[in-house]
Amino acid sequence: MNKFIKMVIDELEEYDRVFDYSMVSEFENSLNCHVYYGETRYCIVFDEWDYVIKIPRYDGRRKGTKINYCQIEEDNYNIAKKYHVEEVLLPIKYIGEFYNNKIYIQKKFTCTNTIAKKESREKRNEMRVKSHTAIYSDTCGYCMAEANCSIDDVWFGRVLSLYGKDFIKRFSKYTVDIGLNDLHNNNIGWLKNRPIILDYAGYYGYGDCSSESY
């Protein structure tokens, strides 16, 4: 595992160094895996594994930052327990440090479901009016005009159906209290038809649309 982690980190760091990700597909083919990369982390997925590997992406250091978003996410999960809303968060676990890089794992999720689509549209609409707007107006603060800066009604309706209105209120308070932003469709998914948020670290980076309050 150590040798594998070192090879992965070396490759990904090199892509960041030269700003060239054209070789990622060759890297994926050589290891028979899928590599995903966003603003803050790398995610490595193997088809035969039931979990994924997450590695903090430190290329932001060229702008003078070195934020470990995986650790922020783990901290946010522990805080969520105090609000009793951790059921909707997909846990992330620190497994060790390899070559000065902290490595985390998270259960593999899906982007689709089979049960949630059966939920009534009335419930989804009721939830949207009472909770959806409050969460985004108070906590998003990032790319408010972007089309992906919203959460699917079916997903939110399933949350309401499973956990109820009080849960939604607690979750809204949780996001506001910790200043959790960057909640949108790209950061949600499903685990055995259970709605989950897979990225709940927020975003404190650079960009014209990020809020200075975060």
Language model regions located:
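Protein kinase-like catalytic core scaffold
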Residues: 51, 88, 104, 179, ...
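Conserved structural core of kinase catalytic domains
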Residues: 81-164
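Conserved hydrophobic "DFG−1" position in protein kinase catalytic cores
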Residues: 45, 55, 105-108, 190
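ATP-binding glycine-rich loop module of kinase domains
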Residues: 31-86
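Short Pro/Gly-enriched beta-strand edge/turn motifs at strand-loop
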Residues: 21-30, 165-175
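Juxta-kinase regulatory segment immediately upstream of eukaryotic protein kinase catalytic domains
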Residues: 1-33
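Generic beta-strand structural signal
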Residues: 45-46, 97, 144, 183, ...
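Catalytic activation segment of kinase domains across protein kinase-like and atypical kinase folds
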Residues: 176-214
